Curated annotation (Swiss-Prot):
GO terms for biological process: rRNA processing. This is Probable Brix domain-containing ribosomal biogenesis protein. It comes from the Archaea. HAMAP family: BriX (MF_00699). GO terms for molecular function: rRNA binding. InterPro entries: Brix (IPR007109), Brix_dom_Rbsml_bgen_prot (IPR023548). Residues 1-169 form the Brix domain. Gene3D superfamilies: Probable brix-domain ribosomal biogenesis protein.
Amino acid sequence: MILTTSRKPSQRTRSFARDLERTLNIPYVQRGKLSLKEIFEIDKHVLLIGEFKANPGTLVVYDVENEKRLSSFISVKLQREICGEKIYNDDGIRIKISRELKDNEEFQKYYEIYDEFLFQHLNINEDSDITLRLEKDPKYLFAIQFYKGRVKIGPLIRIKSIKLFDSLL
């Protein structure tokens, strides 16, 4: 899986992309003038960060092999806003679900979608220091928060809505 942004990302969107690159330990490709087709030739699974009013506003996961895409409207908090420093992840990531969400049937549908499109393509390592935790958020469907041990390191991604499409474009 690779990470990229819209064509001319704002500074905040670039910072968010770099935060995800460091915490998820996946390569970030600067888009420049590359078309989506050229990006799809680099990797079959692409995580694209789109913008809304110069902020990261959408998270689109492309599954090129199955010609599907998952689009989510998001709200974010950067690493520097949460812990004030850059945290690097050299190995995989551990995924945990909060207790409130484990029993929620509606959340299970969202989790299965995200697992198919995103989580299965990450480097999962149960012994990792870095944890991707899915948490309940009162205003949103759910939130994705990153921890190192028990300390929040960010970025925080709040998922507002999820849509599935049967075409890449």
